[in-house]
């Protein structure tokens, strides 16, 4: 893997424009990765994902391991061939899903034992096993197996958790090398909301050495102010010559605020999940949050396009009234068109960010984003 930093934004922000080059192609950063949990982005053909401009998608190690299983995907030569996607894939390690099982799992130094949510069978996932699964998937970017620290966490709980994740991180690197895996491996910073613990985690990861670094443990229920507080210092602790990935954060305004603070990569289920609930992200300020809730009766006879500024298939071909009708009838096409639009909105947002950095007008882009929503630009309180 290679990361090329092309430009840092003019002005007070730390926004960066770069390219991540992996075995299956290039990823323009800042980048948003659509989530394809089971080897598919819900409601989207692979060609649809290409059409909306995505350079990379995210797959889920945990779910693909349980179903269909690596023994099936191995027969196809990896996840790319299995799902017919020829661009880059990042897979998470399975850690977040395992730890979300709550009482169904038991954590030890060796790994995590749990009952399969599919059939109740006893299953064990370790750092080594996570690396082996992701090797079978042939992910372009592999994530270390870590303990996702819950929120809230006491200082001692957060410290114990990050220290376990560091030990697991070393085991991931060792197994990754043992397998001869030439794909990239990213480490994950933990430490909850405690700055000194975040610094301790980052120092430990740097000592181990990874191809890129991710900020974990955010978007887990904490107030936005606490998330921003972590982002005010965290990206600056990460190497400038490596990609910086913020895991699971996906509101458009949160992505923009993270970019202002130096983050390069993002993923979230929000655009696809919200699409299935009739929430469309739009360029304007429909509700001061840039969202059209298409099930509202005001759209029943609305002949206008969903977003006049959007070039997606949905906006170019259908009215708000038709989308309202599809949602009221619970037609599958409604969710599909919403997904196409929302993912295109996110890719247009990222392209706009990249262009603005390239053209030395990023601060103006940020101001326009908030102006359209009738909001002031939040202050930058960088450390």
From Swiss-Prot:
Record has Repeat as a keyword: no
Binding annotation for substrate: 92-96, 146, 190, 217
Region (RNA binding): 248-254, 272-276
GO MF term set: metal ion binding; tRNA-guanosine(34) queuine transglycosylase activity
Binding sites annotated in the UniProt record for Zn(2+): 310, 312, 315, 341
Keywords on record: Glycosyltransferase, Metal-binding, Queuosine biosynthesis, Transferase, tRNA processing, Zinc
Listed PANTHER family: QUEUINE TRNA-RIBOSYLTRANSFERASE
Subunit organization: Homodimer. Within each dimer, one monomer is responsible for RNA recognition and catalysis, while the other monomer binds to the replacement base PreQ1.
Protein name: Queuine tRNA-ribosyltransferase
Gene: tgt
